């Protein structure tokens, strides 16, 4: 069998394009490799946000959405848009799983607990959805409505939760029942790297009201956290309970509705509510009726309000049907993105698909190791290219995104420089074997490290376009106005393969 000349797609997570060089870690880092590629290779900019990826207009892109669109080869209607629409249409209020959980609790005079990332960020959740859930519980007769707020500060400015908390305090005052019952930073409640000690802090807060601090209002609890030097993301377990109020710890028979729609950071805390769990010793394990807003994992046996819509003939599935071999490779932080999300929410590997996982470094925050595990990832990537085994290789480098999220500018520059060296080695390997390479990103981040409006650090994604660069021996000229969902049809075209009818994206090569 002759050695294959692979077509590789390298996704530089969080690597957007911004003309303004102020606080732009990508523009200011020393990047001889990327500079040379942009000067000498076919390249263009493509859209990775808003309506172009199935998000609301102007909404910044994110990794889940980006990889889903890239892999699908069509614009995929995102959960955020789907759920917002269902609320406006009145469908949300009739959703079977939600109705059943709330009505069962009401009938037994039990509490309805609503938990989720309390933020207008729109990446993992949206506070408008949480508001609709609170109103629905109240309308269906729930008297005890407890809201457990996971605070953001990552997809939103680092200290921006007060407006959201005030909004819910006002809502409960208007309803005359229910309250904000707890606060904790997403660092604890939404870990995705098996740091079970962090998750346990959130679990104990929910199930035992075990907290480091207690305050009589959510806004007061937040102010105290800021006094202690904690930004939203890192707020310690805080119980919100005024004199004479009963504990809001979850009890047998209560309903629990988890209002995050994005799976990767919702899985771990959700698994703590399943009988078969070994992450840590649970001091309390209330028998609650738990509803996931969307399916967080196929093996979690809990009710789902919005089951996944299946995608037929994604890039990975289509390659498999053509008898092609493919490799998916990344670090822990983005492994789910190049596998599960890229495959349209399918956990299992397709025939001919292999996966390689490189462990992300075990550091508290990635500014402490901005190169992350790029050296090892690149070694494996180069070996895969030269192995002659794969028709296609999909690789994600997380650095620009994960270090961009820390808000530490110097570290972001170092991350970009580490990436540049890695890309150089990948380019050399591709040229050596006569393969083809597309370099792109799933959304922006590190190109804006300071918020131009406030002058504060900017830790969130951006709505800016991302690069698309071609390396290979074909005479390629790109069309303008492309988007992420055009990548799969473009890759199939470059590989000389037929494009399935389901892929409505355009081929970006003229």
Curated annotation (Swiss-Prot):
The active site is at 63 (phosphoserine intermediate). CDD domains: iPGM. GO terms for cellular component: cytosol. Binds 2 manganese ions per subunit. NCBIfam families: pgm_bpd_ind, PRK05434.1-5. Catalyzes the interconversion of 2-phosphoglycerate and 3-phosphoglycerate. This is 2,3-bisphosphoglycerate-independent phosphoglycerate mutase. The gene is gpmI.
